[in-house]
Structure formats: C-alpha cells, structure tokens
C-alpha cells in the first residue's frame, strides 16, 4: 500500500492537513515529527494515522519507501519554526538541508511534494510583494526557509 507522508504532522498546520485527509477517507498516513514537546498530543489525539515516524529516523525510512514505490505524496510542513532560535547551524540543517533531502528524493522518484514556506521570508513590510527581489528575512528561521524556497 502506498503512503501519504506528513512531516510536522503534530504541528498546527500538519495536524490540520491530516484532519482534512481523514475527512476524505485517507488513513494511509505516516505522521513524521519530533514529539519531545508532549503538548503536541492535543493536535494529534483525534487523528487517524497508519503510523508515526520519529523525525530523526524519517530520511532513512523515506528512502526505502520511495525506492519501493510506496509513497503517494509528501506534505512537508516540518521545520523548527521558532523565530527566536539563534542556532544558525541547527536551523540550516533542520530547515534547509532536511528540506533539500526530501525534495531530492521526491524528484528522483516522481513523488508529489507540497512544501510550506513562511511569510517571514519577506520581512516586516506593510506591502506584500512576492517578487524574488523583495526578500527581507529578518532572522535565521526566515533565512533558512528562504533558501529552501529558492532550492
């Protein structure tokens, strides 16, 4: 059976994607997240998923599933979203490089990928301009998301 993967599935957006998929009858969902924050139970307790994959084990499992044509699609919502995180190395590894690895695997295996960016890549402007010349990331989180967007 083919799987729908939702990274960041215990977060606000990811859990709502799973809820919508459930409402459409989808149960073949693999929820990927870091559950070190136990309060995330409030987002996932009512969801119907096939299995949970810890974030730190995901890439290895994902490549095996993809190699065996067992992935229907990926919703990549997972990221360190704290705009106050000051560990640039962690943000680049977790948000940028992790996203690139997922994207490369999806491209290699023709797996549809839905990726969530962030409005923070445009900075604190009063006017929205989504042109590629108006990027003003004002913290490391925004910069890591911007690089992933450009990838």
Regions found by a protein language model. Name each.
Residues 14, 62, 84, 123-124:
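Glycine/Thr-rich phosphate-binding loops of Rossmann-like dinucleotide-binding domains
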Residues 55, 60-94, 105:
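NAD(P)H-binding glycine-rich loop region in Rossmannoid oxidoreductase-like domains
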Residues 42, 83-91, 124-128:
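Conserved catalytic-core motifs of eukaryotic protein kinase domains, centered on the activation segment
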Residues 93, 97-101, 108, 112, ...:
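Catalytic helix-loop patch of NAD(P)-dependent Rossmann-fold dehydrogenases
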Residues 37-38, 80-83, 121-123:
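Active-site loop signature of alpha/beta-hydrolase-fold enzymes
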């Amino acid at each position: 059976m083919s799987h729908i993967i939702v990274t960041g599935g215990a977060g606000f957006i990811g859990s709502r994607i799973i809820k919508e998929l459930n409402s459409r009858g989808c149960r073949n969902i693999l929820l990927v997240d870091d559950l070190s924050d136990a309060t995330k139970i409030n987002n996932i307790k009512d969801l119907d998923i096939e299995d949970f994959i810890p974030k730190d084990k995901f890439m290895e499992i994902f490549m095996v599933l993809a190699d065996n044509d067992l992935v229907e699609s990926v919703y990549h919502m997972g990221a360190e979203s704290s705009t106050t995180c000051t560990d640039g190395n962690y943000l680049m590894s977790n948000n940028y490089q992790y996203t690139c690895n997922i994207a490369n695997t999806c491209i290699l295996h023709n797996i549809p990928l839905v990726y969530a960016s962030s409005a923070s890549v445009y900075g604190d402007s009063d006017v929205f301009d989504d042109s590629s010349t108006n990027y003003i990331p004002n913290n490391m989180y925004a910069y890591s998301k911007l690089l992933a967007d450009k990838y």
